[in-house]
Regions:
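Loop-helix junctions at membrane interfaces
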Residues: 1-167
């Protein structure tokens, strides 16, 4: 039991680091923020780890990316949105890319696009301006989905879930 908790914690920390890198370092500035593929790694974490670990990895990795990339105003919204994103996926399925997790992409997209639209509308006091960010959020969720599907298929091919036994 203790070994499994340590393994989960280490995997969550590794995911937080990867999420940070693919959010903070490999991003494209758009509108009032930036777009990135870090969400694809949040999706993967949520398919491999129980919710609290995946939520922490997403919130910490993406939140720190905002703090250290000059977008600290986005930190509170990011922490909430990314933690909730982990709820959209299941770590209990035998495979990463399965019907359940493919269906989870839809609410994950809605959370990202809708969550950041609402957050930007609140912090700017102008929902008209917030509408301008939606195309960037769409690019973000679609590119993150491509990363998730490619890596998920590859990891399923080497049976990573049965090898790690994180659930």
């Amino acid at each position: 039991m203790k070994h499994q908790q340590i393994l989960r914690l280490c995997c969550a920390a590794a995911f937080a680091a990867v999420i940070y890198v693919f959010t903070a370092i490999f991003h494209i500035p758009v509108h009032t923020g930036y777009t990135h593929v870090g969400d694809g790694f949040i999706y993967l974490a949520a398919c491999l780890l129980p919710w609290p670990y995946a939520a922490a990895a997403g919130a910490i990795g993406a939140g720190l990316a905002d703090l250290f990339s000059g977008y600290a105003i986005w930190f509170p919204g990011t922490v909430i949105i990314k933690a909730l994103t982990a709820l959209c996926f299941s770590h209990q399925a035998e495979r990463i890319v399965c019907v359940r997790n493919l269906a989870g992409l839809i609410p994950a997209w809605a959370l990202c696009i809708g969550g950041y639209f609402m957050y930007e509308g609140i912090i700017t006091g102008n929902f008209g301006v917030a509408l301008l960010g939606i195309p960037g959020y769409i690019v973000q969720v679609l590119s993150s989905t491509a990363v998730f599907l490619a890596l998920g298929k590859a990891l399923d091919g080497i049976r990573i879930k049965s090898r790690l036994q994180l659930h």
